[in-house]
């Protein structure tokens, strides 16, 4: 498995994965995202010094994306695998490799990663726990997992 920073050429794949019905169940906004709205969001993230999108590939095929975003003194992390890559055990390796290439974090005084996961999203819970994230708190239907940045 290889990871790299996203480029504009990844936009359509990431939108397709985001709008997949299984993916949408696990987003705060579960509606279908328009191409125009996604394009604006995607270009904003690519140009931001506070966000990184990391694409994972296996045998030169894109299998998912990990998003990192500086927010509230920590780095918010989310992960989305392509529909054909789910359930194969790729998620935690994707996440760990993506963390390794990050070029911001503790340098900017963010000392931990943070993932907000729906309680019924068992696959994501397993991914983050396997990657060393620890349950910090629970509120309503959301679990907060954290991991110190090394």
Where are these regions (language model features)?
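Conserved N-terminal entry element of GNAT/NAT acetyltransferase domains
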Residues: 1-9, 134, 148-150
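C-terminal "cap" of GNAT-fold acetyltransferases
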Residues: 112, 138-150
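A short, well-structured alpha-helix characteristic of acyl/acetyltransferase catalytic modules
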Residues: 4-32
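Conserved acetyl-CoA-binding loop of GNAT-fold acetyltransferases
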Residues: 129-139
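Active-site acidic-Proline motif in GNAT/NAT acetyltransferases
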Residues: 82-84, 88, 119-120
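Acetyl-CoA-dependent GNAT
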Residues: 31-84, 139
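Conserved acetyl-CoA-binding loop-helix of GNAT-fold acetyltransferases
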Residues: 87-102, 125-130
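Conserved beta-strand-loop-alpha-helix junction that forms the acyl-donor binding cleft
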Residues: 113-125
């Amino acid at each position: 498995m290889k990871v790299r920073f996203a480029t504009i050429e990844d936009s359509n794949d990431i939108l397709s994965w985001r709008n997949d019905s299984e993916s949408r169940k696990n987003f705060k906004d579960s509606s279908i995202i328009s191409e125009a709205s996604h394009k604006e969001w995607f270009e904003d993230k690519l140009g931001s010094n506070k966000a990184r999108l990391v694409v994972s590939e296996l045998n030169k095929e894109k299998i998912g994306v990990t998003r990192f975003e500086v927010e509230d003194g920590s780095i918010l992390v989310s992960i989305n695998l392509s529909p054909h890559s789910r359930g194969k055990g790729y998620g935690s390796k994707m996440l760990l490799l993506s963390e390794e290439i990050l070029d911001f974090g503790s340098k900017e005084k963010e000392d931990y990663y943070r993932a907000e996961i729906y309680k019924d999203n068992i696959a994501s819970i397993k991914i983050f726990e396997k990657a060393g994230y620890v349950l910090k708190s629970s509120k309503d239907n959301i679990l907060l997992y954290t991991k110190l940045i090394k």
